[in-house]
Every structure is written in structure tokens, then in C-alpha cells.
Amino acid sequence: MNVLVCIKQVPDNSVVPKLDPNTNHVITEGVEVMESPFDLNAVEAGLKLVEENGGEVSVLTLGGEGTKTSLRYGLSMGASKAYLLKDAAFEDSDSWGTSYGLAKAIKSIGDFDVILCGKQAIDDDAGQVGPGIAEQLGISQITYVSEIVSVTADTLTAKRVSPAGEEVVEAKLPVVLTCEKSLNEPRYPTLKRTRMANRAEIPEMDCAAVGADPAKVGKNSPSAIKKLYTPAPRQSGELIKGDPEEIAKIAVQKLVEQKII
């Protein structure tokens, strides 16, 4: 079984982001980076699939030279190969442009039975790239996967989280899965694999190499961010003390003042 996992490098979520109002970008200079956590669930799921069914796991990302550290982390967890899609044309790509580029890269790398992504990246929470890859490749998809139930030569059955509860879905291979945190607990890299990952050669691909049209990505993407801003701070709550009747009277009065009722 050939498995590919898409990894995204994101700013450290323990740091409050600063925004550049002129560019609508998050200021990343001097900010530590990390792998989007749901993507590590995807790597773990891929490793378990090949441990149970044979094959190998490859990891792929789109970004600059610095994103190789995230690919090396995937290798240190147990992936066999890593690929970097790197081209300045992809800068400022929206979810469609990112999905398009990754799908082109996947086609150029080879055939895969299962393609795994995190359910969403924690920097934008869009959750669109995994489904977009499936659409671009014209293959099955199961989103918000909480458990991989079974795999046959032709199908994969998984449980997925939905607003109505939990669903069990069977899809034909090849299939794209987007992974929930509850799917598994990502393993820690071993020292041996970390050393091997640090020495590994990571092939780079650009638009020309994967057959992607630069006119469709980056600033030419179908959508663009109009405004990026931090939410207004919430007011702290007010604690009302007294007997129940008095509390109810004060609470109603305040709700009327706020025009809530």
C-alpha cells in the first residue's frame, strides 16, 4: 500500500500572532514554527496503515526551504520519502491554489492508494485543502475521520465525525482522508530515525516539474483575503450575588439594558 501524507508548517500556536495591516499577512519573522497537529495524526495513520498492510509512507509539503524541517519530522516519525513543492508562484495561494498545486505534485510523484491530510490547519482552520485535492484528482474522500475500520484491496472503511453524530463510510481506493485528533496519538521520533532524517535528501519540485500553471496560483488564485484582523477582546463576566429573587431581578434588568430581551 502506497500512502502519501500532506504536511503543513504553521506558526507556533502558543504565540499570539501579530498582523501586518498593509499586507494582510501574519508576521512570521522571529516566530517559531511547528507542524500542524492534525497533520501529525495523518502521518501516524499512514504509518499504521503500512505497518498493517505493507508498503511505504511519503510526506509532501508546499512551501519554502524552511519547510523541510517539517518534512524531516515526518521522516523521523517513520516516513520513507519526502518531497517539497517549492515555487515563488505559490505565494499567497488560496485553498484552491494550494490543492491544485499539491494534486499536481501528487500526480507527478506516482500512484497512491491513500492520501492523508489533517482535518484542517490550525493557522487558518479552513479545512478545504484535503477535499480540494480529492476533487482535483477525481478520487474518493472521507473527511473528519475518527477511526479507520478496515482496508481491502479495493476499499477503505472509516468512521467520520459529522454534525449528526458518527457515520461509517466505505470508499473506493484511491481515497483522500482528512484526520481528526481522536484518530490516534502520534508517535515520537526515535533518535536513530531523527539522525537519518537530518541526512536525507529531499527532492524539490516547481510548477514546471509538476505541470502546474503559475497563472492559476498565488496572487492569481480565485479568492483573496480581504481583511485579516484580531477579534475584539471579550468583556469579563459579572458575578451577581444575593438571594434568588434579587439575582433574577438584576439579571433581567441587565439583559433589558443590553437589549438582549
Residue ranges of model-derived segments:
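N-terminal glycine-rich FAD/FM-binding segment characteristic of electron-transfer flavoproteins
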Residues: 1-261
